[in-house]
Amino acid sequence: GQDGYLRPEYVERINGIDSIIKNSDPRVQRFSGYDQLNFLQKIRFKPNENWNLQYSFAYAKTGDAPRYDRLIQYRNGALRFAEWYYGPMKWNMHNLQILHSKKTSIYDDARLTVAYQDYEESRIDRTRANNNRNRQVELVDAISANWDATKTVGKGEIFYGLEYVHNKVGSFGERTNIS
């Protein structure tokens, strides 16, 4: 790889003081890993030939993910950041689909999909020799409902539907003195 991505040294906080430590192997990207968990559950219920109900739940979470390109930045000949990482990302989604396949006066097939998503992510940074840790958090709640239908009319087919989407987005920042 490029020499610019080597890590000859890194910052470690020892007894409340940011200390620059020589890396025994500059090719090792110290403190650059993260963990991740994903989960998916699906359930289907078909009580008869006309109705089909499906529910799914998805969940994902990561641990802290260091921003390696920021942790190797220099300013005035010394490492700029003591900390720079993405905080845990959390996401979950509930999704319910109901399909009705029976000819009525207004449709031949209709599908209702209702979903809810909850998402959170954050960014944390602290410059070297500074006791203030900055944390920026983003929160998103998303609700949606969609109804689609088809109807055969003579030799043609009509497709129509309705949709509602509501996103609530929030963001806040905080500064914490770590000393």
Where are these regions (language model features)?
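Transmembrane beta-barrel wall of Gram-negative outer-membrane proteins
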Residues: 1-65, 90-91
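Flexible, surface-exposed loop regions and adjacent strand-edge segments
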Residues: 2-16, 69-79, 126-135, 174-179
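Extracytoplasmic loops and strand-loop junctions of Gram-negative outer membrane beta-barrel proteins
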Residues: 21-27, 37, 76-83, 93-94, ...
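Outer-membrane beta-barrel domain signature, especially the mid-to-C-terminal portions
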Residues: 28-30, 68-70, 83, 123-125, ...
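Face-selective signature of the C-terminal outer-membrane beta-barrel domain
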Residues: 46-60, 89-179
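Structural alpha/beta core scaffold segments of enzyme domains
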Residues: 85-87
